Amino acid sequence: MKLKVLSAVPYKGNSIYELRKILSQNDVDLYVFPEGFLDSNTLTEALKIIKNEQKYIITGFKDLRNNGQHKVLVIDNGKIVDEYTKCILTKGEKEKGKQHGEKITCVNTKFGKIGVLICYEIHFPEVARIMSLEDPIMLINIIGTGMYHDLQLEQWTTLAKARAIENEVYILGCSHYEEEIPLAYVYNSVGRCELMKTNECGGFVVEVDLDKSNAKVINYLEDRVPRLFNVLSE
């Protein structure tokens, strides 16, 4: 089975306009928008648009009622059907008093479970691995801003490739388009790059081969020795 997915790189600061534009220009199975794309002030109008367009969306959401806590929402034809709260925060986010989520878990979608790593969480293999225990059809990495420099871009995409390889699953990522280096990427379940866009805005469409994500040719999960990993939780 193949899933047609759009990875959105919208201009930051005008989410309703960007939402209308991207939804009207493309017809796919699943739309993915970056971290903080919607917030408490734009959510109601966005839900109406998504309902009218009859679309299925995974988007970043900034909960202004909870000090800007970052979440991911799964929206089916204008209805929020699941959500996940960012669990691993940057030093800057903690200094601002943001609260982390209490459970690392996949979100449920009509296509199957999907693990959504919110921005900085890509740096922690434990997050993707915990999500992979739920046998997701793919991983998604929604990013707030773009990359600040070429080195960060190289590091970030290398980490994404590693997450794909070690979990034998597709991973898709996207950021906003602003002054930094915006990007959209896709790595397949063996770590081969199927999409890499930098310094471009808009919606980028790929076909995710779910059979490849399900194959688990090596199946690293079966070779884990969890009792030896206890030190990670100390």
Predicted features and spans:
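Active-site-proximal beta-strand elements of phosphoester/diester hydrolases
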Residues: 1-12, 32, 112-121, 140
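Active-site metal-binding loops of divalent metal-dependent hydrolases
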Residues: 10, 36-37, 121-122, 144-145, ...
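Active-site donor-binding loop signature of nucleotide-sugar glycosyltransferases
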Residues: 10, 85-86, 109, 199, ...
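CN hydrolase (nitrilase-like) catalytic-core segments centered on the catalytic cysteine
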Residues: 43-59, 125-203
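Conserved hydrophobic/aromatic beta-strand scaffold that supports enzyme active sites
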Residues: 72-74, 83, 104-106, 173, ...
